[in-house]
UniProtKB/Swiss-Prot annotation:
Coiled coil (residue ranges): none
Residues bearing the modification Cysteine methyl ester: C69
One Pfam family in the UniProt entry: G-gamma
Species, as recorded: Mus musculus (Mouse)
Protein name per its UniProtKB record: Guanine nucleotide-binding protein G(I)/G(S)/G(O) subunit gamma-12
Residues modified as N-acetylserine: S2
Gene Ontology MF term list: G-protein beta-subunit binding; PDZ domain binding
Keywords recorded for this protein, A-Z: Acetylation, Cell membrane, Lipoprotein, Membrane, Methylation, Phosphoprotein, Prenylation, Transducer
GO biological-process terms attached to the record: G protein-coupled receptor signaling pathway
Family per record: Belongs to the G protein gamma family.
Entry superkingdom: Eukaryota
Length: 72
């Protein structure tokens, strides 16, 4: 590979890197303490509708067997 091609590839790679860094720098950031407080608040507000915390009523559970086994 010639040095001209290598330098062209290097410049293209550097431009992609700069573009990616500019994109990342423009992202709005919040402090971890605020993000965790918001997450805790969201979890507490939606806890009643969370089936993993409250469970699924047996009448609404589509995976529960409708009838028992005759052998048992």
């Amino acid at each position: 590979m010639s040095s001209k091609t290598a330098s062209t590839n290097s410049i293209a790679q550097a431009r992609r890197t700069v573009q990616q860094l500019r994109l990342e720098a423009s992202i709005e950031r919040i402090k971890v303490s605020k993000a965790s407080a918001d997450l805790m608040s969201y979890c507490e507000e939606h806890a009643r509708s969370d089936p993993l915390l409250m469970g699924i009523p047996t009448s609404e559970n589509p995976f529960k067997d409708k009838k028992t086994c005759i052998i048992l």
